[in-house]
């Protein structure tokens, strides 16, 4: 019909005194991954920020303990297959958000051990002073900035 149904709240973070940001449904529609923090929308600045997973058909919510660390986990993006995701984390030094990748099993809802995006120079992250706040996965090479949106979707 091209129309939306009645809105439905699937999780009330405010009941736990928390805030949700970056909710993203998995490509198969089975899961909703989101960032949970104590307050606000700029979770990258909150060390307590963690990734959570809601199972859509049961409403069960759990912390993604297999990827969360003692520091910030924030913005995340599913791969087009739903078998991988990337997220920003400050787990290395508490200062700079770095892109970590993890596999995901849609049958079990479990993530694999996260790993940092490899670089040619093993010391790259020791001297790189920029942050990966919003990592995105793309499906094709980006030849120029005007084509970025096509590569993401």
Features from the language model and the residues they span:
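Sequence signature of WD/YWTD-type beta-propeller architectures
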Residues: 1-153
